[in-house]
Amino acid sequence: MERWPWPSGGAWLLVAARALLQLLRSDLRLGRPLLAALALLAALDWLCQRLLPPPAALVVLAGAGWIALSRLARPPRLPVATRAVLITGCDTGFGKETAKKLDAMGFTVLATVLDLNGPGALELRARCSPRLKLLQMDLTKPEDISRVLEITKAHTASTGLWGLVNNAGLNMVVADVELSPVVTFRECMEVNFFGALELTKGLLPLLRHSRGRIVTVGSPAGDMPYPCLAAYGTSKAAIALLMDTFSCELLPWGIKVSIIQPGCFKTEAVTNVNLWEKRKQLLLANLPRELLQAYGEDYIEHLHGQFLNSLRMALPDLSPVVDAIIDALLAAQPRSRYYTGRGLGLMYFIHHYLPGGLRRRFLQNFFISHLLPRALRPGQPGPVHDTTQDPNPSPTVSAL
């Protein structure tokens, strides 16, 4: 085909005018998505010059630019006005940062913490307005939940409760399922599932009245079978399914439900090396003799080191998660799922589309120990069978 002379400036002028208008209205998301869209438009321009006559090429390029800018538009948000939000787990991490951001935006924030005199609570008192109210709550204690429900009803009597952010979470152990005491599964379920369930059910009358929002911080570990995170992952899978069920059941009431799926971020609870060392020592101290001989103490030490090394990739900037929570609270049409964090798209692509063998190999290299258990190493004797019963005792640790 003979190449047509291509005055592409007309299409680009339309795209630039639309982009400028969106910028003036603060309605354009800047950053890598915008750069990627411009690169794709430039590639499309190059193809149009070679394959299409000018009128058709003008329509295609201008239409593609219009669609791209529409996708990059900031979704319309509801006004903050006098909205009140309850956030759990505000001692550290996502909860604390979200509480500070919502308070700065003008929300009435009810922030639950484990320790009213802890560093997180002290920081919130110092940096936030008098509108923010701190509430002590341990999600493993029904009496704490009941007290918070009563205080919330009284505190929001005039404004109503717009949103609940289920952020509090707990991970007790990083180890193979066989090495993980059953009590660690129960502890994760108490905080990550049953506590969130009881609190959410208790607040539903207020949320039905306001036609508000439920936002829950989940985890990719609830979607994918990460080795050595079974106790944490199963509890997150349970809460995700519960929230999906709520999403269907509460739709007629006008309540919108969202789940935030963050990648690896540098929160205090995740990167507390001393805490993970104590949990490793507790695991070793309570392992039955047979299991310790079959796996070897060096296997557990190596696994612990691999896990800590993986945390070096944790992202220090928590704002992507905080921004996702805020969007779920204020967007006119919030998403049911928000995926935040580096590499999550690739991980989900592998999990959903690659054959099972490749998926398992990928997950096995996530941070799992590459050292074989002692009984599987060449030249090692088989495991010793211990006929004594060991209940795997472990003291209960409250949510962090």
UniProtKB/Swiss-Prot annotation:
Domain of life: Eukaryota
The protein's name: 11-beta-hydroxysteroid dehydrogenase type 2
Residues binding substrate: 219
Originating species: Rattus norvegicus (Rat)
Segments for region (Disordered): 378-400
UniProt family annotation: Belongs to the short-chain dehydrogenases/reductases (SDR) family.
Modes of activity regulation: Inhibited by glycyrrhetinic acid. Induced by progesterone, through the Ihh signaling pathway.
Known tissue expression: Highly expressed in kidney, adrenal gland and distal colon, and at much lower levels in lung, hypothalamus, hippocampus, and midbrain.
Chief site of localization: other
Catalytic activity, reaction form: an 11beta-hydroxysteroid + NAD(+) = an 11-oxosteroid + NADH + H(+); corticosterone + NAD(+) = 11-dehydrocorticosterone + NADH + H(+); 11beta,17beta-dihydroxyandrost-4-ene-3-one + NAD(+) = 17beta-hydroxyandrost-4-ene-3,11-dione + NADH + H(+); 11beta-hydroxyandrost-4-ene-3,17-dione + NAD(+) = androst-4-ene-3,11,17-trione + NADH + H(+)
EC numbers, comma separated: 1.1.1.-
Effects seen without this gene: Homozygous knockout pups have reduced Na(+) and water content in the skin at birth, but retain higher levels of Na(+) and water in the skin throughout development and into adulthood at the expense of K(+), manifesting hypokalaemia by 15 days of age and contributing to salt sensitive hypertension.
InterPro entries documented for this protein: NAD(P)-bd_dom_sf, Sc_DH/Rdtase_CS, SDR_fam
GO process annotations (BP): cortisol metabolic process; female pregnancy; glucocorticoid metabolic process; regulation of blood volume by renal aldosterone; response to food; response to glucocorticoid; response to hypoxia; response to insulin
Residue ranges, compositional bias (Polar residues): 389-400
Keyword Nucleotide-binding: no
Active site as annotated: 232
Keywords: Endoplasmic reticulum, Lipid metabolism, Microsome, NAD, Oxidoreductase, Steroid metabolism
Residues that bind NAD(+): 82-111
GO cellular component: endoplasmic reticulum; intracellular membrane-bounded organelle
